[in-house]
Amino acid sequence: MSTRTFLEVEAKFAVVDTAVVPDLTRLAGVEAIASTKTHRMSAIYYDTTDLRLTRSRITLRRREGGDDDGWHLKLPAVAGRLEVHADLGEPVDGLYQVPEEILSQVRALVRREELQPIAQVDNERVESVLADAEGRPLAEFCDDHVSAWSLLPGGSPSSGREWEIELAGDTPGTEQGENILHSATQLFISAGARVSSSPAKLVMALGDSAHQAPLPPFLVDADVDPDSPAAAVVAALKLNRDKLHEYDPKVRRDEWDSVHQMRVATRELRSHMETFNGILGGEELEYIESELKLLASMLGYARDAEVVEERFLRLLDSEDSDVLDETTRGHLREDMGTEYRRAHRRVIATLNSDRYLDLLDAIDSLLADPPVVGAHAAGPGTPEKVDEADDTEQPAADLPAGDEAEAGEPVAEVAPEEEAAETVAPQPQTAEEVEAILSEHLEEAYQRLMKRHRKAVENWENPELTLHQREDYFHDMRKSAKKLRYAAEAVGAATSLKTKRLYNACKQMQSSLGDFQDFRFARCSSRQWFVSDCGIHGRLVHRLKRRDRGFGNISHF
């Protein structure tokens, strides 16, 4: 079953039953009412028993009537809401099943929980299409008379009237669209309406019955001293966990830069666990760190393929001679995208696996009941051992469809004498003591970066090392810079310590070294693909046949 995705930008207003719709041609840019229709619609809304979709500002409904029968999933977006539509499909044993294409978009939240009806909303809608002077649709105005029922325990019926204006055509995200919504707000309020306190009809339908539902695991607050270092660490981990939830559906939709951002969130989450080792600890933490490393590896494989493709395409576009015709260029672009598409399919298989869902459950459990070490907050624990653990992201053999993927991030081994025993300090009570403990962990992260910096610089011209080994030292340095950057952000958010300059400096260093690493990976990958018989070089030879000049021109990539 296919889906359709678009951005919904609208404004809602509550009105009394006797309110009169004002002259809609008074809205900015509106010259005519192109058409008016009446629809009778009925929608069933679905969620888990703990309302994890509703609490995340996500609505899922199956609606009949109107011009868009089917399943509608609405997700938060930067401007407005992202709508995903799917056809109704055929019922199974008399019941309609949520399409997999829709369910996959919320799997990171729903996981193994059953989606069940939570409300019914019936709506008699008078819909008017508002057009400009050329007849182009600008917006749709809906006059809705709503009857709703909560299907939750303690639910009751409700009813009301609502005006809704939704931008249409090319107006969402434009200044013209903003002007339409602004003028609509002024016009409707002057006609007796008020901005709706319910952003969705579902909220009105559920009413007070929503408060009786249990909290989902990711909303359970940890029972820790709010002034302790543990509370600061948990707050930082929650932000990263929420980013995983945010980018999961974006990766599934293959939105631009989503793989990269989900990988960053995964690494930052794990980095915090390692940097603040000694404040939190235990086997569950170690399990999560290990699983996050595997997830980052799968995402890294796709990200690396994406980087190589982007760099190659830029080089291809800069080749402005007539040696390569458009057909050949098209073949090369297709070839370069194949590796990323293959890697992305492996990522999706990973996100659909039980192992990934187990990881999400484990993270929620840890944040709800954090394993504070010995009921204390400690000073730095085993920095070198922890730091080196982040340097290889090797996927496990039982990860679905991606067991051969490797992140390609080697690192030098750690001498046993570098490992330090974990220490435990009494639970602090003052802000100064909290800052002292967190700053100690920050200092350890800084010293790890300095050690790697010295190692990279001192060995850059070492004739006993290969170029690959010398470059690895700079890559290790970059990873330490990222750890320090993440730690600086977390400590700055939790204390009065001024870490912004440190954060920005680490970000700049990470960016420069990241460009170096991307170029390095692209260089190695391109060389491998070009020289292989089944790679680009071999396919290019086959396609160009006797065009030796063209082949020679391409080979410099």
Residue spans of the language-model regions?
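Cationic, histidine-enriched alpha-helical/coil surfaces that engage anionic ligands
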Residues: 1-557
